[in-house]
From Swiss-Prot:
InterPro entries: DUF1444 (IPR010838)
Family from the record: Belongs to the UPF0354 family.
NCBIfam families per the UniProt record, alphabetical: PRK13668.1
One Pfam family it belongs to: DUF1444
Name recorded for this polypeptide: UPF0354 protein RBAM_026940
Amino acid sequence: MKMTSRKLADLLKQRLQHENRSFFFDREKDTLRVEDQTTKKGITLELPPIIAKWETKKEEAIDEIVYYVSEAMEAMEGSGQEMSGKEAGIYPVIRSTSFPDQTSDGIPLVYDDHTAETRIYYALDLGKTYRLIDSRMLEKENWTKERIRETASFNLRSLPSVVKQDTVADNYFYFFRANDGYDASRILNDSILHEYKQAAEGELAISVPHQDVLILADIRNESGYDILGQMSMSFFASGTVPITALSFLYNEGRLEPVFIMAKSRPKKD
């Protein structure tokens, strides 16, 4: 069966059906919006990337999206999302610079600039999902942005890491995949980056293709850049929340975006 945007939209409507939800399919933009009828809050899904995943993962791709949307909608529809008393559940999350800087209601989200490709947003963990923190939440509870930043940074450092190592063509790759929703966020943990930089025999390159993986690479020869580029593109295409397919070099505590050119060393952006 060939999957089309219309077929996918109908399938998702069926799987996500709820008495208090509305669905809006935009044929021109190839999107499906799932919206709470009471609050008018919701999620807009871009269908082409989901179709691309369906081509290789079939029902598993649909299951992932249904789970992601269901948890996010329940978080929006629920209550009790105050930050006070839940400080231990505040974490930073990495997003691309093209990610919206405000909610669907037009309320500014709290974020900091990170690199030319990425931003740091802040989230309140709700168990199976999380809510991005916006300016209204800060005002309501009289929190400052600095307090959010410091709290999130402290909590991130307390998270355990799950790392898998792979060696390809004498280059070493380390995959951080704890599947806790904050794997990419570990790029903000300077102690981790410093540790791997000190141990690296070559250049330390870093990739955050989507929110559920951080790749550190000890690049020891020219082919290492090509391999990292291929890995990053593959993860970027398969992630539920893609960030960037570009990589970074880590030098003197700074991240420098680079374009990895085939058969050559990277060129700085």
